[in-house]
Amino acid sequence: MKKLITIVFIGLISFSINAQDKVAKIKFKTDTVDYGTIEKGADGLRIFEFTNTGDAPLIVSKVTSSCGCTVPKWSQEPILPGKTGEIQVKYDTNRVNPIRKTITVISNADTPTVALKIKGEVIDSSKESVLEKKDKSLVEK
């Protein structure tokens, strides 16, 4: 009877050790998306692709942005080992200014917090700068 209890106990310990070895790992194709120079009102949707390189299901529990002008969207479903997922980021391109924002991804991966970045510049080509107006007036004379 003691041998049976010992065998069951050792089996349970080895099972729990094996269960702890499995971990999800998140690997992004890139951690920065460059919008470049885009027009005011242009499509502000960009995608961050990632792969679960671990051996346990990956669950992205929360994605936040450093500004309300950037809205992230992601799947709540677990990403199985070896499979890919995506985080969609929509920037409000009605704001004419440089883009420098951080998107924070929280998951059950071995690195639970990952910072992604978007950068670029939104311009309004319908508005001419003072220098452009001055140059045009000199050419016309």
What does each of the following model-derived ranges do?
Residues F50-G54:
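Asparagine-centered strand-capping/turn motif at beta-strand->loop junctions
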Residues D55-K83:
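Surface-exposed binding patches on compact interaction domains or structured appendages
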Residues D92, I106-D110:
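Beta-strand-rich extracellular modules
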